[in-house]
Amino acid sequence: DWSSDVCSSDLNMAENKIKTIGVLTSGGDAPGMNAAIRAVVRRGLSSGLNVKGIYKGYSGLLNEEIRDMTARDVSDTIERGGTILYTARCAEMRTEEGQQQAAEICRKHGIDGLVVIGGDGSFAGAQKLANLGINTIGLPGTIDLDIACTEYTIGFDTAVNTAMEAIDKVRDTSTSHERCSIIEVMGRNAGYLAVWCGIANGAEDILIPEKYDYD
């Protein structure tokens, strides 16, 4: 189980003699990813590490879309949405051959440690690389809040506030016409976003996948 392995991992840069780290964003983008990238790059550089940006997630890793990052690369990015490293989904990382190739490319480019910003699928890929000897750290970045071992994820707060703005407008119209509105929010198989928005807006009922079997 990747979640227990990630939660129990303890990466010490000095002990592992890490000199170069890579950072990538994978899967769906989430608000705040650029701020996380900026923090990784700036902290890495200030710690005397080489930092390599991996573009387009695991797909970019397999295609060796990798370049050195400087402080200038992350300037004026903290307030921007999306991800400056771009993102993509990568079916090849689900295969043993793809995982082996990704690990070999990390070693080829001298990447001693990899920072993966993404959701559960991204973490699954990171765990596969860890099993192949690549030091990995996962930063939970998903609006769904469906990552084990954490109570908060990058992007969740913005998702709640964005949904709240839309729900407030719908509620005004519903009240004016004496109607009942059913509002669906994102979250896939996790009901956290629905619960937070429902409580904040005083919903009469909140239907979540953890409570109901929709099949």
Where are the regions a protein language model picked out?
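N-terminal phosphate-binding or glycine-rich loops at protein starts, especially the Walker A/P-loop
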Residues: 14-62
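Short, small-residue-biased leader/transition segments that mark boundaries at the very start
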Residues: 1-8
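Short Gly/Thr/Asp-enriched flexible loops that form oxyanion-binding sites at enzyme active sites
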Residues: 35-40, 121-134, 194
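Accessory alpha-helical/coil subdomains and C-terminal extensions
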Residues: 116-118, 128, 135, 156-177, ...
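Glycine-rich oxoanion-binding loops at beta->alpha junctions
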Residues: 4, 14-15, 61-116, 153-166
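Short, ordered loop/turn segments at secondary-structure junctions
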Residues: 26-29, 54-60, 89-90, 119-121, ...
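Short glycine-rich or small-residue beta-strand-to-loop segments that form or flank ligand, phosphate
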Residues: 20-28, 84-88, 112-116, 181-184
